[in-house]
Amino acid sequence: ADDEEELRLLVKKARREIRASYLKYESQENPDQCVLIQEKLRGQEYGLDVIHDLKGNQRTVVVKEKEAMRSGETDGAKTVDHERLRRLGQILGSLTRHKGNLDVDAFESDGVCYVLEMNARFGGGYPFSHAAGVNLPYALVKWALGQEPEEKYLAARAGVRAQKDIRIMIYKEESK
């Protein structure tokens, strides 16, 4: 929205669309607060994989600069050495003490880091950490067996740029 009047119209339209969809059930408890307005930031978006062992001990934080997005998911990224964001991931991990991966979306704007969302799961950006050398599935299996994975499986190389690819595969052509 370019101004408050346009914002009010867009919120009104969004509420009308919510009332006309299945979301009306999700928002019926407080219909006046069914629309979330998020400030648009100018800057760079990042993805963090905050990796812990199965006891909740922090093992590593991988920072990826998002270069391309598709349908809200990271489509292209580069692993980077970003000390401030790595430290942010360490702080979040020390507070959550989660097990496995904490997928964090962060934004840096005018030198300030913002956390957009956190999900305790393999996120759509994990393949970029994997491409840079991290092998979290292997580490999780080792930890589940009471063993320690080799450090190389928890270390991401900075500067690895990767892109997801979607291809249509024909496995077998039906004969007529």
Where are the regions that the model predicts?
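A general structural signal for well-ordered secondary-structure junctions
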Residues: 7, 17-20, 99, 150
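ATP-dependent carboxylate activation and anion-phosphoryl transfer catalytic cores
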Residues: 78-176
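Phosphate/diphosphate-binding glycine-rich loops and adjacent basic-rich segments that engage nucleotide
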Residues: 1-14
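Active-site donor-binding loop signature of nucleotide-sugar glycosyltransferases
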Residues: 2-3, 39, 65, 120
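ATP/adenylate-binding site constellation spanning eukaryotic-like Ser/Thr protein kinases
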Residues: 4, 42, 133-134
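Phosphate-binding site of ATP-dependent enzymes
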Residues: 11-90, 94-96, 107-108, 112-114
